[in-house]
């Protein structure tokens, strides 16, 4: 289209404009040289893109533009016209152009129809070629020659090239067939649309982007003319506009960016002409004319010998060309370096881009800059003409040189370089540097045509920069269009391509094999953030590939085993099978005897088995740390006294400290020791019990103690008595005052004294220490226990003590409450604590105490003093330590249980005090129970009533205090019918347990005390009958095997209990310290209850026969049940224990296995049976009244504690769930109490195979085992082609096979002449007719890939193998740009929670610290500030230009100046400024200048960069800051600081306009 136009001319200068888009012209403009004098010709110069007029331009000369006017040319002409002739003439011109355009368009009658969309005929061949290369990439991945990342990159590259070549074919098709095709004209004239959209209409839609901008591998091959399939339609919508909501959100974020920009710079207005600054910025180079245009020179510039351009000159376009040509450093002024305080001066700003002349005064350049920067974001977010998510690559691939015709390659010389691997997995040659002569030929292609003269195509060195890729080699034959060279366009861009990670998973389960894996393990480098957490320092070691790695996954069935009990020390898992064994389904693979290194309890809950560990485990494992524990206990618990006797408890104590309840356990053990001391009155029994405690204390000296048990006990008892006089000063005095409740403060002193005593005399002090020690650990509680022992010495004293004991109970409670507080006067503060915790408890306790005191006196008189005193002592202890008191002399085994029980109570108490109000209630209820039980001990009579009421209400009582108090009162009444009461108690206990069991089960500590026993009893009732039958049968079967031996052993045990014990101790010392301890406890218990044993002669007989096996023992118990109903209770508990330990139906099996274990440690296990809860119950039933009283408290404890406590504690802290797989068989065994001993198998597990196949191996990793089986489906058999005559021999046939057994073959590898493998794998077998291959997949790992597996790992399906890293191609779209631009404007330090490496603040600080070393402070400050300003401007402009948006540099500079206008004070000196305060740099410079003149010290400061939001909020104008964000915070601070707002800038009057109107009205 040629247009002629006449217009008037003024004095025409070379126009100072230059179209920014001129580089995008689709046509070339050629110079026209007309020698005729008529009409003057205006020439468009291609190089400078400006219009030059001949010098002899005549007035009113018509100008002729002989060129096709598209959009950009029109822009250029109108801009020049405006500059030359002003606005009025330009408006007329544009109006005329519009009319001409409409007129011509109407005449042409161009229309657009469906038939105008002509699809290029080459499309089908292009698509088929692309799909072939896609198949090749998939095969290369299958063969292990490509990584998955390279495959996807190659696919994307292939389809991108296909799409591009299709576009070119479409354009060529239009030009060749119909140059006036309306679609073609519309796109190429710039009227509407662009080539990208025409491509979608007639070629193919191409690759699509997902919402994150990443390219999808699936290209849309259709175009809009053909129509899209459903899949293609969904894909094309996925990345295009991503829905209206998305657009709305993005528009909001783009608008918010504009608002922040406006708020930050709205006050920047041109007020002054010249700030007289000495600072500026420099440009140098050949391509700086755009940068110079419109700026003002800072210094004079010498152009040549004759001309000097003075400073403060505005650089026009012609001057810019001249300045760029001289290639010198040009100093110009910039808004960054303007010296005005808050705005910019006229000369620093320079040209007004809208007017084309120097900016006027009063121009709001800040808001113009903000709008110029913010508008592209809004506009581009909304640009509906965008290509719709079609992948348009940022940085289109490298410039390529295809072969123009078929020919042969010839190189002139050897080229330096190296082979590299491209992102698409191709191996090419990288040229390191270019030749010395740029005109020299790099390579030439010579056509191989025979008929014509050969054609030659040459590529010169200057065309191919260093870093280019060479795709052909010397002498290679090339085809037309084949890629020869890719020229690199290496850009020094700081913007890194986004790096993405790709996870590679195994497609099937199997075994891993590393073929070649060059691995480097690096510990993660922690970026130095503002606050690094200490946790970050222990980071996992990462394993990277330092080069390409190859590995395989061989298919097999992997069966995982969830056991964490596999033998980890040896690092092996034992199996019944060896490699190559054939396994059928449900075959046991291996057997595990589950052994636990700790002592614990097994409990069955629903379908799972829980292992609860008791306190004992610590005793066993940590015997040697007693001294350490000792100190820990002192430090932690304010318990000053921990004697050597308490060693066992001490060891437990520190261990349990990890769990909150552990400390309590320790205390319990102490209480039990104290009980033993009380029982010292009975010489034999006392000595045994004492030994037991000592044994617990000193494992190493067990033998010696055993040998001289009687001596030691006697000595200790003597000491005790004798110490009574000595102790009266220290210990005894303490106890007496406690009893009398004379002074509590004495107790503390006494405790300290006790500690001293221990240090002085370990042996003697041990006894005393035990009692005292108890007081210390339980603080007052233990002290009370000591008093009981003294009472036992003198019956009268005992009675008195009991009275005191009533008071003591209250003391005990107080101690428990104030256990951690250590109050000086324990009585008063303890009572207070009780009151606070619950009034009911205090009242109930007090009543019980008073009644107890009275009753105890009368009862004691009637019955034997020694027995009563013992029971009384127990009662006192029980009140203090709920569980401990019950078993003082009864059972050593029960004693261990007691420990656990006491610990539970103590724990609950401590928790109450320290932690939870809710728990306090429950704990208090427990305390009441303890008191009740203790009262029972004191008054055996009351037991009767107790049995009736308590059986049903005891558990409830724990919840309701009133019921308990009633039971206390009723206790006093009945003394006569003791035995009958006992029987009732037993029955009621059973019922009681059943009723209460469900309600209390859920509670942890509470449940342990009360409900667990009940629960067990339930089990006993239900399973009891069955057990009896089963066990009896077993007896019959097994008696013949070991009757003789067993009988002998049993007899020995029964008759000579003590000597047996000594022998056992000697034997056990070497093997199991734990077992020894248990056995000791059991035997002394038997002595205590020796009468009961004698009573049941049948029991003795039964024991000898079944002794060898646990079954027999159980039978003995059964016989007891038959003999006496009283024992019946105890027996069920025994049975129930067994049941609980075993899983549901495997009880019989468990018994059998137990017999085996017994043989190993025969003596130890038998005592355990006797010493369990069962014994307690038996004693209760059979013991004399005195014994019964003692036992009854034990019974209550057993209900609440002995069974349940350890398990609930474990559920809270230590319990482990043992997860059993369904496919496996379990046989459980455990002792009666459900206790599990160390090194004794609790169950035998048979792991069964889940599949049929060939066993490969077992692997242990991370405490989990897995087995590998090769199934039939994991192998493939190839039938060899029967091409060979049948006569030929086997060997010759074999020779034809190109592979060998054990070889790894890849997809496509030739295995037989002319035949390739259709899969990858390892050859297992080669015969005459077939080859068997184990399926496998080879993988390729790229450099810097993260490896997650190790050699020979057994992997389940979808297991992560490695993480590949790649730089991802992304679409260019402002959608990706806005977050980046916002990140720069806000000077963000973090992104997605991770610190950005080399962020603005890091760069500024590091540059400033470096500059300070070299330069003086002020110079370093200016340098670093200018550095970060220029860096920020450059990065922002780069981010915009990546989106195809050009913004004038000065706009960005105005904004960046505001972001760096403040500094941070580091040291205020004489300025009264605070460190960390932000202040305007110009203001601070004024302050410092005046300080220096007054000879004071100026403030020190450092440069900072504030994001837009922070700089607005830091603004001096509080109205601006409050209108932006955080209104109330800003206004309150400003009011407190009494700030004044001077209403500078454009927006302030808007905020207060309404106020000023009101003032006028007033």
UniProtKB/Swiss-Prot annotation:
Gene field: rpoC2
Superkingdom of this protein's organism: Eukaryota
Localization annotation: Plastid, Chloroplast
Textual note on the cofactor: Binds 1 Zn(2+) ion per subunit.
Main location (coarse class): plastid
Keyword Acetylation set for record: no
Keyword annotations: Chloroplast, DNA-directed RNA polymerase, Metal-binding, Nucleotidyltransferase, Plastid, Transcription, Transferase, Zinc
Catalyses which reaction(s): RNA(n) + a ribonucleoside 5'-triphosphate = RNA(n+1) + diphosphate
Cofactor requirement: Zn(2+)
Subunit note: In plastids the minimal PEP RNA polymerase catalytic core is composed of four subunits: alpha, beta, beta', and beta''. When a (nuclear-encoded) sigma factor is associated with the core the holoenzyme is formed, which can initiate transcription.
NCBIfam families assigned: rpoC2_cyan
Region (Disordered): 1-22
Residue sites binding Zn(2+) per the record: 275, 338, 345, 348
Organism from which the protein derives: Chlorella vulgaris (Green alga)
Pfam families, alphabetized: RNA_pol_Rpb1_4, RNA_pol_Rpb1_5
GO biological process: DNA-templated transcription
Protein name stated in the entry: DNA-directed RNA polymerase subunit beta''
SUPFAM superfamilies registered for this protein in UniProt: beta and beta-prime subunits of DNA dependent RNA-polymerase
Function: DNA-dependent RNA polymerase catalyzes the transcription of DNA into RNA using the four ribonucleoside triphosphates as substrates.
Gene Ontology CC terms: chloroplast; DNA-directed RNA polymerase complex; mitochondrion
GO MF annotations, alphabetized: DNA binding; DNA-directed RNA polymerase activity; zinc ion binding
Listed EC numbers: 2.7.7.6
């Amino acid at each position: 289209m040629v247009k002629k136009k006449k217009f008037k001319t003024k004095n025409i200068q070379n126009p100072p404009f230059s179209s920014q888009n001129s580089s995008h012209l689709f046509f070339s403009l050629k110079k026209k040289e007309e020698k005729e004098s008529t009409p003057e010709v205006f020439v468009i110069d291609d190089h400078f893109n400006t219009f030059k007029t001949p010098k002899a331009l005549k007035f009113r000369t018509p100008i002729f533009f002989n060129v096709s006017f598209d959009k950009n040319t029109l822009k250029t002409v109108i801009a020049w016209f405006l500059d030359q002739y002003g606005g009025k003439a330009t408006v007329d011109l544009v109006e005329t152009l519009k009319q001409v355009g409409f007129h011509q368009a109407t005449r042409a009658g161009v229309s657009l129809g469906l038939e105008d969309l002509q699809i290029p005929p080459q499309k089908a061949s292009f698509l088929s070629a692309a799909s072939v290369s896609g198949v090749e990439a998939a095969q290369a991945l299958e063969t292990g020659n490509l990584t998955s990342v390279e495959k996807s990159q190659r696919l994307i590259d292939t389809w991108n090239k296909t799409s591009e070549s299709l576009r070119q074919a479409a354009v060529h098709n239009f030009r060749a067939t119909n140059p006036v095709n309306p679609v073609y004209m519309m796109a190429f004239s710039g009227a509407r649309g662009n080539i990208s959209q025409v491509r979608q209409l007639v070629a193919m839609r191409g690759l699509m982007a997902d919402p994150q901008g990443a390219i999808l591998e699936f290209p849309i091959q259709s175009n809009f003319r053909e129509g899209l399939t459903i899949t293609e339609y969904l894909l094309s919508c996925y990345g295009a506009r991503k829905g209206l909501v998305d657009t709305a959100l993005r528009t909001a974020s783009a608008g918010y960016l504009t608002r922040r920009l406006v708020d930050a710079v709205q006050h920047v207005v041109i007020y002054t002409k010249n700030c007289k600054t000495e600072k500026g910025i420099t440009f140098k180079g050949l391509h700086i004319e755009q940068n110079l245009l419109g700026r003002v020179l800072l210094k004079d510039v010498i152009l040549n010998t004759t001309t000097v351009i003075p400073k403060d000159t505005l650089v026009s376009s012609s001057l810019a060309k001249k300045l760029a040509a001289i290639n010198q450093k040009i100093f110009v002024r910039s808004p960054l370096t303007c010296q005005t305080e808050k705005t910019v001066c006229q000369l620093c700003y320079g040209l007004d881009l809208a007017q084309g002349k120097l900016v006027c005064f009063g121009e709001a350049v800040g808001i113009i800059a903000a709008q110029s920067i913010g508008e592209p974001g809004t506009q581009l977010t909304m640009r509906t003409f965008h290509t719709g998510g079609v992948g348009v690559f940022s940085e289109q691939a490298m410039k390529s040189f295809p072969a123009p015709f078929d020919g042969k390659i010839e190189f002139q010389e050897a080229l330096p370089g190296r082979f590299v691997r491209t992102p698409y997995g191709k191996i090419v040659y990288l040229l390191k540097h270019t030749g010395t002569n740029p005109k020299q030929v790099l390579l030439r292609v010579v056509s191989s045509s025979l008929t014509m003269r050969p054609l030659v195509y040459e590529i010169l060195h200057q065309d191919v920069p260093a870093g280019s890729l060479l795709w052909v080699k010397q002498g290679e034959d090339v085809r037309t269009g084949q890629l020869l060279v890719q020229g690199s366009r290496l850009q020094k861009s700081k913007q890194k391509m986004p790096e993405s990670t790709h996870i590679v998973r195994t497609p099937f389960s199997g075994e891993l094999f590393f073929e070649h894996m060059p691995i480097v393990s690096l510990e993660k480098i922690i970026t130095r953030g503002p606050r690094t957490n200490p946790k970050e320092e222990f980071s996992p070691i990462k394993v990277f590939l330092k080069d390409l790695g190859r590995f395989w996954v061989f298919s097999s069935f992997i069966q995982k085993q969830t056991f964490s009990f596999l033998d980890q020390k040896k690092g092996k898992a034992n199996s019944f099978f060896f490699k190559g064994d054939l396994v059928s389904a449900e075959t046991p693979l291996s057997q595990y005897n589950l052994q636990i290194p700790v002592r614990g309890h097994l409990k069955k809950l629903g379908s799972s088995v829980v292992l609860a560990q008791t306190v004992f485990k610590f005793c066993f494992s940590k015997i040697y740390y007693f001294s350490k524990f000792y100190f820990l206990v002192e430090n932690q618990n304010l318990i000053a006294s921990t004697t050597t006797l308490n060693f066992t408890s001490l060891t437990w104590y520190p261990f349990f400290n990890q769990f909150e309840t552990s400390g309590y356990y320790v205390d319990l053990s102490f209480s039990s020791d104290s009980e033993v001391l009380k029982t010292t009155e009975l010489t034999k029994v006392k000595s045994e019990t004492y030994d037991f405690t000592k044994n617990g204390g000193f494992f190493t000296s067990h033998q010696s103690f055993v040998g001289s048990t009687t001596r030691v006990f006697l000595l200790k008892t003597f000491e005790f008595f004798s110490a009574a006089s000595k102790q009266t000063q220290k210990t005894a005095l303490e106890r007496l005052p406690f009893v009398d409740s004379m002074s509590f403060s004495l107790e503390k002193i006494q405790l300290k004294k006790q500690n001293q005593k221990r240090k002085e005399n370990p042996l003697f002090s041990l006894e005393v220490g035990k009692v005292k020690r108890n007081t210390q650990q339980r603080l007052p509680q233990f002290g009370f226990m000591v008093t009981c022992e003294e009472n036992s010495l003198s019956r009268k004293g005992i009675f008195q003590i009991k009275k005191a004991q009533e008071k003591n109970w209250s003391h005990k409670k107080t101690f428990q409450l104030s256990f951690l507080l250590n109050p000086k006067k324990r009585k008063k503060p303890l009572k207070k604590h009780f009151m606070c915790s619950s009034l009911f408890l205090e009242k109930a306790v007090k009543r019980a105490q008073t009644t107890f005191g009275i009753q105890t006196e009368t009862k004691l008189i009637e019955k034997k003093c020694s027995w009563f005193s013992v029971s009384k002592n127990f009662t006192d202890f029980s009140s203090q330590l709920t569980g401990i008191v019950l078993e003082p002399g009864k059972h050593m085994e029960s004693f261990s249980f007691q420990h656990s029980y006491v610990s539970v109570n103590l724990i609950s108490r401590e928790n109450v005090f320290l932690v939870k109000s809710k728990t306090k209630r429950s704990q208090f209820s427990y305390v009441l129970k303890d008191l009740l039980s203790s009262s029972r001990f004191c008054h055996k009579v009351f037991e009767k009533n107790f049995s009736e009421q308590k059986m049903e209400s005891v558990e409830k009582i724990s919840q309701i205090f009133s019921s308990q108090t009633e039971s206390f009162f009723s206790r006093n009444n009945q003394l006569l019918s003791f035995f009958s009461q006992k029987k009732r108690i037993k029955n009621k206990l059973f019922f009681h347990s059943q009723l209460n069991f469900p309600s209390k089960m859920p509670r942890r500590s509470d449940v342990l005390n009360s409900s667990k026993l009940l629960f067990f009893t339930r089990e006993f009732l239900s399973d009891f009958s069955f057990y009896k039958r089963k066990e009896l049968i077993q007896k019959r079967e097994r008696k013949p095997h070991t009757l003789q031996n067993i009988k002998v052993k049993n007899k020995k045990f029964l008759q000579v209990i003590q000597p047996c014990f000594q022998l056992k101790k000697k034997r056990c010392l070497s093997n199991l310290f734990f077992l020894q301890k248990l056995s000791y406890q059991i035997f002394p218990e038997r002595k205590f209850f020796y009468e009961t044993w004698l009573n049941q002669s049948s029991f003795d007989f039964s024991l000898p026969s079944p002794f060898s096996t646990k079954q027999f023992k159980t039978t003995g118990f059964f016989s007891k049940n038959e003999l006496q109903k009283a024992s019946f209770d105890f027996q069920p508990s025994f049975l129930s224990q067994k049941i609980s330990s075993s899983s549901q139906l495997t009880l019989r099996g468990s018994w059998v296995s137990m017999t085996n274990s017994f043989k190993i440690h025969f003596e130890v296990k038998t005592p355990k049976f006797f010493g369990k809860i069962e014994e307690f119950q038996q004693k209760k039933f059979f013991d004399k009244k005195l014994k019964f009283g003692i036992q009854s408290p034990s019974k209550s404890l057993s209900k609440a504690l002995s069974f349940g406590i350890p398990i609930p504690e474990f559920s809270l802290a230590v319990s482990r769930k043992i997860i059993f797989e369904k496919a496996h068989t379990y046989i459980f065994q455990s002792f009666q109490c459900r206790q599990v001993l160390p090194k004794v198998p609790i169950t035998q597990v048979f792991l069964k195979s889940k599949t049929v196949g060939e066993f490969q191996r077992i692997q242990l990793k991370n405490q989990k085992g897995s087995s590998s089986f090769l199934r039939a489906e994991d192998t493939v058999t190839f039938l060899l082609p029967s091409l060979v005559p049948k006569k030929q021999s086997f060997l010759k046939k074999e020779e034809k096979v190109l592979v060998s057994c054990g070889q790894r073959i890849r997809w496509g590898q030739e295995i037989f002449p002319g035949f390739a493998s259709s899969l990858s794998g390892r050859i297992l077998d080669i015969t005459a007719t077939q080859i068997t291959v184990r399926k496998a997949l080879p993988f390729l790992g790229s450099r810097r890939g993260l490896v997650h597996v190790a050699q020979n790992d057994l992997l389940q399906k979808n297991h992560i193998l490695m993480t590949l890293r790649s730089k991802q191609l992304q679409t260019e779209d402002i959608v990706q740009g806005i977050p980046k631009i916002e990140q720069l404007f806000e000077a963000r330090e973090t992104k997605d929670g991770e610190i950005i490496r080399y962020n603005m603040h890091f760069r500024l600080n590091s540059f400033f610290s470096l500059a300070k070393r070299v330069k003086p402070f002020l110079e370093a400050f200016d340098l670093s500030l200018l550095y970060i300003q220029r860096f920020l401007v450059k990065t922002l402009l780069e981010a915009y230009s990546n989106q195809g948006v050009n913004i004038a540099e000065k706009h960005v500079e105005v904004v960046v100046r505001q972001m760096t206008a403040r500094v941070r004070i580091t040291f205020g000196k004489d300025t009264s400024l605070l460190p960390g305060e932000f202040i305007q740099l110009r203001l601070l410079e004024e302050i410092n200048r005046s300080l220096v003149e007054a000879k004071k010290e100026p403030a020190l400061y450092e440069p900072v960069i504030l994001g837009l939001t922070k700089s607005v909020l830091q603004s001096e104008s509080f109205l601006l800051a409050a209108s932006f964000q955080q209104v109330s915070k800003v206004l309150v601070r400003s009011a407190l600081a009494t700030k004044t707002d001077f209403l500078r800038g454009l927006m302030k009057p808007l905020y207060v306009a309404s106020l000023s109107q009101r003032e006028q009205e007033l």
